[in-house]
A protein has these predicted regions:
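A glycine- and Lys/Arg-enriched "phosphate-lid" helix/loop adjacent to the NTP-binding pocket
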Residues: 148, 268-334, 347, 356-357
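Conserved substrate/cofactor phosphate-moiety recognition/catalytic segment
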Residues: 186, 190-243, 339
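A structural motif corresponding to the C-terminal end of an alpha-helix
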Residues: 62, 108, 127-128, 246-248, ...
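Short loop/turn segments at strand-loop or loop-helix junctions that form parts
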Residues: 38-39, 69-73, 199-201, 255-257, ...
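Glycine-rich phosphate-binding P-loop
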Residues: 171-189
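Glycine-rich phosphate-binding loop used to anchor ATP phosphates in small-molecule kinases
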Residues: 230-280, 295
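Nucleotidyltransferase catalytic core that binds NTPs
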Residues: 1-169
Length: 358
């Protein structure tokens, strides 16, 4: 038997943190149904869809709990009845969406509002519900969205797994064959004290050759038949490895899911954006120039004659994608210095959040 039939938990969740999760669990434990409503402004740095996804991941399987998000671009003014009603209009609309999803539009009303904020009393009053304060002094979880935005790295331990994966600053090193991507990415991970994610494409190639030899023991690298599915598999597995490796605020990757689209172009002879349509947008791409780097044949490489073309393909693709990137050139030491400088700037920029509407 629960205390309430339908509870509302409403906030920006910008970003979701341990205090938010404590609040949601408290509401769900005492309510038959719980609607978590994420209201985000378009001026804010984290899209509402991301916040909703992170909350859903953390609270998956909670009976009666639904997380919904919507846009609320109204200014905040707790002294204005008119402004209050603008926000409440959005909140009621989201509660209506929940009721429609449940197949019972008449069940939209709530009988409890769970919150840790001072506006909880007024919100509950306007909804004809009871306000249930949860840790308003933040003694159980001494964290706030403001604190996380001000210094995400210092508050990293207050973030759930899905939020960490989504917020992590990813540094991705890409480049043509034998241009030092693996060496540079390893060096960066060591210098930054960050996890390192190896390239999956090589492992897939080795496995593909082994599979081909199950049909023809004499099969060689040059005779492999590459398909779109191969590169979709590479992109998917590269993303899985990357997400699994996230622990701290920074991650260094030797290639990523998007890079698989460039290699698909190289082996299939045409652009294939469908290889990785939902690839992450890293904090920074580093493109290793082929100029000045001798080609080293390790038995698995076949693109010495295409290195300049591949460098241009990466350069064009990165520019078109509109992501932060930098070409690193010169000696190994020069490349490392350039990369470290670019990483410092990129990580600082990545963790700079727009202020919420006040």
């Amino acid at each position: 038997m629960t205390d309430f039939d339908h509870a509302l938990v409403l906030g920006k969740f910008y970003p979701p943190h341990a205090g938010h999760h404590h609040l949601i669990r408290a509401a769900a434990a005492r309510s038959r149904r719980t609607t978590v409503t994420v209201l985000a402004s378009r001026v804010e740095s984290i899209p509402v869809a991301d916040r909703v996804a992170w909350l859903r991941a953390e609270h998956a399987g909670t009976p009666g709990l639904v997380v919904l998000g919507d846009v609320d671009d109204h200014e905040m003014d707790f002294d204005s009845d008119a402004v209050w009603e603008l926000h409440m209009g959005v909140a009621r609309a989201v509660l209506g969406r929940r009721a429609i999803l449940d197949g019972d539009p008449s069940s939209a009303a709530v009988d409890a509002v769970f919150s840790s904020e001072r506006y909880g009393d007024e919100m509950a009053k306007r909804l004809g519900a009871r306000h249930v304060p949860v840790d308003p002094d933040r003694t159980a979880f001494p964290v706030s969205g403001t604190a996380v935005r001000a210094d995400p790295r210092a508050n990293w331990d207050h973030l759930a797994r899905a939020t960490r994966v989504g917020l992590c600053a990813r540094i991705v090193v890409v480049g043509a064959e034998s241009t030092g991507t693996t060496t540079l990415s390893r060096q960066l991970a060591e210098r930054l004290g960050a996890p390192w994610v190896p390239e999956y494409g090589r492992a897939h190639t080795e496995a593909k050759l082994a599979a081909a030899r199950a049909f023809d023991p004499g099969a060689d690298l040059g005779g492999l038949v590459w398909t779109v599915g191969d590169f979709q598999d590479v992109a998917r597995r590269q993303r899985e490895l990357s997400d699994a490796a996230v622990s701290g605020p920074v991650l260094v990757c030797d290639n990523d899911a998007w890079a698989a689209t460039a290699w698909a172009h190289r082996y299939l002879g045409e652009p294939r954006p469908d290889v990785a349509p939902d690839a992450h947008r890293p904090a920074l791409y580093l493109l290793t120039d082929h100029v000045g780097v001798p080609f080293e044949q390790d038995g698995w490489r076949d693109g010495e004659h295409l290195r300049a073309w591949m460098t241009d393909l990466f350069r064009t693709g990165l520019a078109a994608r509109g992501v932060p990137w930098r070409l690193v050139t010169g000696s190994p030491d020069q490349r490392l210095r350039q990369a470290l400088e670019a990483c410092e700037e990129a990580v600082a920029r990545h963790f700079r959040f727009a202020d919420p509407l006040g």
